Amino acid sequence: MIGIDEDTCKVGLPNLEYFTSDATNDAIEWLYPNKEFNPKAALDTVILASTNEAVDKWNKTIQDMNPKDSKIYKSRDTFDEVDDEKDILKSILNPKVYKSFNRNGIPTHELEFKVDDICLVLRSLPSLDIATNTRVQIVEFFEHSIKVKTLNEPKSRYICIPRITFKFRLPYGESYQLTRVQIPLRLAYAMTFNKSQSQTIHKVLIDCTGEPFAHGHAYVAFSRVRDCKNVRVFVNKDQLHETGIRGREFEQMPFITNIVYQEVIKVEIDYDGID
């Protein structure tokens, strides 16, 4: 369904079961029966969400179920003045301040992991033949690296992920560049719709409370599994509407926004070429 305005671009999900946002525990129970962390179940289970904030929240919730001890890796951060002759911000850019800076695709200053955690690799590592967004499971910790097992390859491999260097501009002005040396991993019990592309997963909970906000988001999310019985959606109560169909198991149905670029549906007609 393609809508032409905010009132008509909603798509119903008539054949999917759902959890509402006040039933988070029920959603987790569906993913992990008895709310017990199961490393094998975690391999084939994922939560998809539209925002990094929602992803971080879900990741923390699931990781807290893992009974293993955690290890914290802190980055080595330095900053360089790039082109600011006035030197306005230099006085306030102490380590405590710039270690709080984060950017998408770059690991945070402090990372906390546990053995059996599911993660994504944030950068391609050609020397290890690892591509960006490869799913891995943590096996063992070392001082400056983490041993992992690859998951989405025909044959799993055991490799050590080292610290690598990231560079990005600071948000308080393009005059400063932060250099961060950190392990290129991020928890992946949950991931954004975009990050899930190319992933095939057995069991998926799709968090639609944030609504898709880009073309193709909904398609990517709902095409990660082969059987709709292994999909549940997580929605706000105001996203439920009466179906108008009697005799259905659910009298209400969740609706989400369908985003389609105008360029995709735009039709150009050459009137001069019409006889």
Description of each model-found segment:
Residues 1-275:
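RecA-like helicase/translocase P-loop NTPase motor core
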